[in-house]
Amino acid sequence: NVFLADELNRATSRTQSALLEAMEEGQVTVDGETHPLPKPFMVIAAQNPYGSSGTQLLPDSQMDRFMVRLTMGYPAPESELELLRRKQACNPLDNITPVADQSTLAAIQHEVADTYASDDIFKYIVRLTTATRSHPDLRQGASPRASVALASMSRAVAWVQGRDYVIPSDVQFIFADTVAHRLLLTRQAEQEQKNARDICTAILQKTPAPRVK
């Protein structure tokens, strides 16, 4: 149910194409025969820094299929120290236990999907994504798929917070993580060392949020 793609930006184009089919259509094709993937199904991918040996930029179409993109960075010194201590005592993987099974995850997905988002929230989402399409520092803005993903992620944030309805702060919290990796900067913006996350922050600041009723 979970496919982990390590060093995705070192994969061959044929591998990229196969993964795209799995993510978009929920199936894989082997020797001309199509096989449906189990549900739920999700992909978690890791990338090496662009410019490292053998890396390449992922196609825009594939980046658009990933719902969110997170940058891990380096661990805090305290976390790194704890990592060393755990590795010395035993293999941390030996102590991993499941926290949910397939049916539990499916039930959570249904609950998240049932989380209410008002028409005002939908209009807010569309205003945000539309703003990326006319931004002077972007040559490619967020696609309609980004709007759908932002609505889904906003529902998930609301559910985690214990609510059965979405409020504007849910959208704001997840906006950059959901949208930034789908944006393409202009050459001038790249030369000025601007980045997509900062542009998302600026768009949030300039776009009026609906009032919570």
Per-region residue spans from a language model:
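Hydrophobic positions in the central parallel beta-sheet of the AAA+
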Residues: 3-4
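Canonical AAA+ ATPase core
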Residues: 7-18, 23-100, 105-115, 155-160
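Electropositive phosphate-/nucleotide-binding environments in soluble metabolic enzymes
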Residues: 13, 74, 119, 148, ...
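Alpha-helical structural signal
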Residues: 16, 40, 63-64, 80, ...
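Generic alpha-helical structural context detector
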Residues: 20-21, 68, 82-85, 126-130, ...
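Alpha-helix N-cap and coil->helix boundary residues
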Residues: 58, 79, 116, 120, ...
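Conserved AAA+ ATPase small/helical "lid" subdomain
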Residues: 95-150
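C-terminal engagement/docking regions of AAA+ P-loop ATPases
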Residues: 132-213
